[in-house]
Amino acid sequence: MTTDTHTLHIEEILELLPHRFPFLLVDRVLDFEKGKFLRAVKNVSFNEPFFQGHFPGKPIFPGVLILEAMAQATGILAFKSAGKLAPGELYYFAAIDEARFKRPVQPGDQMILEVEFIKERRGVARFKGVAKVDGEVACEASMMCARRREA
């Protein structure tokens, strides 16, 4: 565990997110401020299982998984900002808008995920997300997540 309250290592991420291999797409939180922003990292390895078919001979990290990585970073920020969920509550990824892909992400890249809290109303929070490689925007989108009780 870390003593720096603005970073989170994988053990702490696993306590917050339900995702596990091969679908956990956040390796470490570099910095965050509750209710404001979060910066995280996803190290892209050639060993990712989807590279076998996306695409043979020209591996490219699937765009939908870049969005999922940003959504997971958003979930971590939501958990750290709003606190633990009550029994029977879940966070749901509710919407994505204005998604744009600017450059491919390839094995060996380190993807920096930056998410910013925009506003929250009646349990629905809006965020802005950007994924960057070497300072260059790979993807950007607006996202929403909803805090709801299980039916």
From Swiss-Prot:
Gene3D superfamilies: Hotdog Thioesterase (3.10.129.10). Keywords: Cytoplasm, Lipid A biosynthesis, Lipid biosynthesis, Lipid metabolism, Lyase. GO terms for biological process: fatty acid biosynthetic process; lipid A biosynthetic process. It holds the Pfam family FabA. Belongs to the thioester dehydratase family. FabZ subfamily. The active site is at residue 54. Disulfide bonds: none annotated. SUPFAM superfamilies: Thioesterase/thiol ester dehydrase-isomerase. Involved in unsaturated fatty acids biosynthesis. Catalyzes the dehydration of short chain beta-hydroxyacyl-ACPs and long chain saturated and unsaturated beta-hydroxyacyl-ACPs. The gene is fabZ. This is 3-hydroxyacyl-[acyl-carrier-protein] dehydratase FabZ. Its EC number is 4.2.1.59. GO terms for molecular function: (3R)-hydroxyacyl-[acyl-carrier-protein] dehydratase activity.
